[in-house]
């Protein structure tokens, strides 16, 4: 009888733990562009050019990998460091890492609902990618988008930017 109670308590503990993890995980999972604002803006023919000009006014040059975050550096931002390092290593020389606080750029804040976000400008100052670093729970158990971003950044000929607004992951 005693072992049955022991097993019942063990099963109850395991179910409680898994439920707590699931609830916590669901709170960490959010949409990158929940109301479709970025998707709508990106359909304008001048979107790429306007975003590059906005970045130019922030002294961001060609060949930049721009990390868009907040001044408070939320938990989800801390998970992007490995992605940033992998991306810069894969792109090689000619690319520099730049940090941009969304709080300081109201026009960018009006476009992006969630951070961390990634913007890649190639060496010809063309927008190549705008979107998240990764998707999934905590942005480390899901899909790492670094290889795709590298292929977008180095694709020839240039066919326009990839705007990844349809993503779900750890965003603030």
Locations of the language-model features?
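Short extracytoplasmic/periplasmic juxtamembrane "stem" segments immediately C-terminal to an N-terminal membrane anchor
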Residues: 34-52
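Membrane-embedded segments
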Residues: 81-82, 107, 115
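Thiol-/selenol-based redox modules, centered on thioredoxin-like
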Residues: 134-172
